[in-house]
Design a protein with these regions (language model features):
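P-loop NTPase nucleotide-binding/switch module
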Residues: 170-209, 213, 240-295
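Walker A/P-loop
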Residues: 219-260, 325
Length: 516
């Protein structure tokens, strides 16, 4: 007897419907075809025990199972449930009436309970696209999958419950999530606030510009100057996620298994801060079973790299292409996977190995050669991709001792949102362009072209600072953002002057300047 059930295979953000074909004939062999990985091949033992604990017997027959399409790799334990249901159907223990109506996904424990899986949200989106009536998932994944409307999502705890449901012996209510209500109710702001930061007004200004235009930024300063403190408060001034951004971000975290318990939607912009010992695979993604890396988990949010020179140099260099293209293609011998990674790159570093080069209160013990070698750990091509390079000095005691708090994040956020609204209106006809940092060269020429005086200033800066063509474009993008913050239609001379001032690390005399 031949029976078919349906499930899905996840490869990056791409999901393919998989047909599980189960045939029972005389014999005692178990054959599983269709390019399943080790977890899929091991499913026989889990299914056998789960059936026994659920009150069924594993068929004494020749069982042949095919996972179609057979040339597509299937990975993970989410195939346990459709395989078990298919075996029960082929053995006559469960009627096939509803098999064509539902997609099944879930891992089976030996006692028949269903364990959560990765990628429930993109699987639900695929199930709706394929016009399935419903999706049966482990209970822990139900709210995540129920974000997809026009699809009945049933969260089940055990295999026995699934059998009772598809046999019409027991009724279950589908999980219902009001997506918009849930999204806006949980869209809370960051608990940290720039009002807590005393002084450092120039750095706050740089961070405001970065947030307004989606620019990458690096802060250079001695220990204790507030680099990490200010970076961690950046989410408090970023514009809120849109619903479409939230769905896209949630899909990535779903695939990585990073969604919290009973979380249906990510409503805050991600803030990822990997340790400097991170590997290339953990940073950009990949592995034996392809998983999104930190750059994709930071999609639509912030990737913060503290103590940037302490990262492995080859690890940092793999950031160059994703920073430019805003997506990453992971190619291996057996697969190729694409992940989006449009994020703000924020970094911090000390100015020298001892950390106190240019500090007015501490003596630096590093030689000019040591300082330059330390700075050279960050390659020129990577620095070129960082729009804003900001120097930080320690806050004087008179500023620390002030009782008055700094400007609250809410005020800064209002200005950032207004600037983003200007950009959204400007780029509404350009697909995939939402902020100034994403402008193409043609768009820079159209929207950020300076006048003759501005061109003369840029020429002088290019010659004195030995700036690259990429740095030239970055300056114009930042100047456009400064103009948007001021509500100016055109890029003016003082906008360019401020933008040029944010290219501190392009100067070749860093180790001889003696100050920050």
């Amino acid at each position: 007897m031949l029976v078919k059930t349906y499930c899905a295979a996840v490869n990056g953000l791409d999901v393919t419907t998989v047909t599980v074909e189960v045939s029972l004939t005389r014999g005692v062999q178990y054959h599983l075809t269709g390019l399943g990985d080790e977890a899929v091949r091991e499913s026989r033992s889990r299914i056998s025990a789960a059936l026994q604990y659920s009150g069924f017997k594993f068929p004494v027959a020749d069982i042949t199972i095919n996972l179609a399409p057979a040339d597509l790799r299937k990975e993970g334990s989410s195939f346990d449930l459709p395989l078990a249901v298919g075996i029960l159907g082929a053995n006559g223990d469960v009627p096939e009436t509803h098999f064509k109506e539902f997609m099944f996904v879930g891992e089976l424990s030996l006692d028949g309970s269903l364990q959560p899986i990765k990628g429930a949200l993109p699987i639900a989106i695929r199930a709706r696209a394929e016009h399935f009536k419903g999706l049966i998932v482990p209970k822990q994944n139900a709210r995540e999958a129920a974000v997809v409307n026009k699809l009945e999502v049933y969260g089940m705890s055990t295999l026995a419950e699934v059998v009772s449901f598809i046999s019409d012996k027991q009724k279950f209510a589908p999980t219902i999530v009001d997506t918009r209500k849930e999204f806006y109710e949980n869209q809370t702001h960051c608990d940290l606030d720039y009002a807590d930061v005393k002084g450092q007004e120039n750095v706050k200004r740089a961070l405001e510009i970065a947030a307004a235009g989606g620019h990458n930024l690096i802060m250079v300063g001695p220990p204790g100057s507030g680099k990490s403190m200010m970076a961690k408060r950046l989410p408090s001034i970023l514009p809120p996620l849109t619903l479409s951004e939230s769905l896209e971000t949630t899909q990535i975290h779903s695939i990585a298994g990073k969604l919290g318990k009973n979380v249906s939607l990510i409503s805050q912009r991600p803030f990822r801060a990997p340790h400097h010992t991170i590997s290339q695979v953990a940073l950009v993604g990949g592995g034996t079973n392809p998983q999104p890396g930190e750059i994709s988990l930071a999609h639509n949010g912030v990737l913060f790299c503290d103590e940037l020179p302490e990262f492995n140099k080859t690890t940092l260099e793999v950031l160059r292409q994703p920073l430019e293209d805003r997506h990453i293609t992971i190619s291996r011998s057996k697969y190729s996977t694409d992940y989006p990674c449009s994020f703000m790159f924020i970094a911090s570093m000390n100015p020298c190995p001892c950390g106190y080069y240019g500090d007015p209160t501490h003596h630096c013990v590093c030689t000019p050669g040591q300082i330059q070698r330390y700075m050279n750990k960050i390659s020129g091509p990577l620095l070129d991709r960082i729009d804003i390079q900001c120097e930080i000095t320690p806050v004087p005691f008179k500023d620390i001792s002030k009782a008055a708090p700094g400007e609250p994040s809410a005020n800064i956020r209002e200005r950032v949102i207004k600037a983003r609204e200007i950009q959204a209106a400007r780029y509404k006809d350009y697909k995939g362009i939402h902020c100034n940092a994403q402008m193409t060269e043609r768009m820079i020429h159209q929207f950020a072209e300076p006048d003759e005086a501005g061109i003369d200033m840029l020429r002088m800066a290019m010659e004195k600072l030995s700036l690259s063509a990429r740095a030239y474009s970055r300056i114009l993008k930042v100047a456009r953002t400064i103009a948007d913050l001021e509500g100016c239609e055109h890029v003016e001379l003082h906008h360019l002057a401020e933008a040029i001032g944010y290219r501190a690390l392009d100067r070749g005399d860093w180790a001889e300047r003696g100050h920050i």
